[in-house]
Structure formats: structure tokens, C-alpha cells
Amino acid sequence: MGQQTFEFLLLAMSALAVIVFVALYYVRAGYGMFHTPKWGLSVNNKLGWVLMEAPVFLVMLYLWWNSSVRFDAAPFLFFLLFELHYFQRSFIFPFLMKGKSRMPLAIMLMGVVFNVLNGLMQGEWLFYLAPEGLYTDAWLGTPSFWLGVILFFIGMGINLHSDSVIRHLRKPGDTRHYLPQKGMYRYVTSGNYFGELVEDRKS
């Protein structure tokens, strides 16, 4: 991927974020309690999550392995943090989910496209397009790096705890929907997504 392609995708993803933000005021995304047959074909929720999230983990792994700077300290640590997050989201979180919900195939495919682009753009920048000398070993001695690492693990802790709160809302056999009230949900509507946002501020 060249610099121009990267910049185009950066603008396209930013524009798409605005479009989706506005659209979701008028359209209910058809998963969870809003899943309806109108969304067409659907897949098992656990399978859908794995297929949707795994591409970003695999794309980043491929780009890292083929990079000449893959074992440089700073890029390598960024890579490990990134993969730690997405390994949990791709291969652990789905199998902890309870219930028999289904995910619309259309939403899963949109997630695949987003995650492929997410992995491509972050991996290409980190391992191929970043200016030479930007991510040197000296980066590891800066306060901003260690503050970012601390924020990453705080965010991950919030995310994991919030997911646990959601999983324990219902007793076995109960199919009703409940609003979580514990942990970060006392302060924000989506404690799990808030945790991910904090994680993403690591760099």
C-alpha cells in the first residue's frame, strides 16, 4: 500500500464513520435485542463474532511477519498490545457469550470489511509507512509511551469487567433483556465500548 492509498483510505474511513453515526439515528442495527428477520440470512452469534473479528488479528500478524522492522522494540510492543486486544475479541470473547442469539450475515460481512481495513491501515503505517526513525527504542523511555500502556490495560480491564457484567445479567433460561447497572455502566451507557475506547488511546 502506498502513501496515497493510505491517505485515501484514511479519509474514506473517516467519512464512513460520520455516515454510520448519522444513519444509526434512523436505523436500528439488527443484532442483539434489535435482531429481526428483515436483515435476512443470519449466522450463529459466536461464529459471526469470530469470522468478523479474526481478520484484523490475522492481517496485522501477516503484515508484522513480513516487515523488516518486526523485531524493533517499539513496533514489536505496539504489535503485541494490538494482537492481545484482538486475540481476546476474536477467540476468547465469543466463546464466553451466553444465549443463542444470531447475527445478520450482512452485519457480519460489514464487520469483516471494516476489520480488514483496520488491520491493513494500522499495520501498513506501523511497519511500512511510518517515517524512518519515528518508532525508535528511545520511544520506550518516554512518559507518553508508558502512560499509553497504563491506559491500555486500564481500558482492557474496564472492557473485560463490563463484558462480565453483561454475561451475568440473566439467569439460565431467562431470555429477557436487562440494562446493566454495575461497574462502568453506572457512569456510561456502554461500559464495554468505553473500555475499548480507552484501550485505543494507548499510542
Provide a role label for each language-model segment.
Residues 1-87, 92-107:
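Membrane-helix and juxtamembrane interface regions of eukaryotic multi-pass membrane proteins
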Residues 17-30, 85-95, 116-125, 150-169:
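Transmembrane alpha-helical segments that form the membrane-embedded catalytic/substrate-channel core
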Residues 50-61, 110-127, 152, 159, ...:
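Core segments of transmembrane alpha-helices
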Residues 171-197:
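Solvent-exposed interhelical
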Residues 68-70, 127-139:
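Membrane-interface helix termini and inter-helical loops of multi-pass transporters
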Residues 202-203:
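Conserved small/polar residues in nucleotide/adenosyl-binding loops
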Residues 78, 104-113, 139-152:
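Interfacial segments of alpha-helical transmembrane regions
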Residues 103-119, 181-187:
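Small-residue-rich segments of transmembrane alpha-helices in multi-pass membrane proteins
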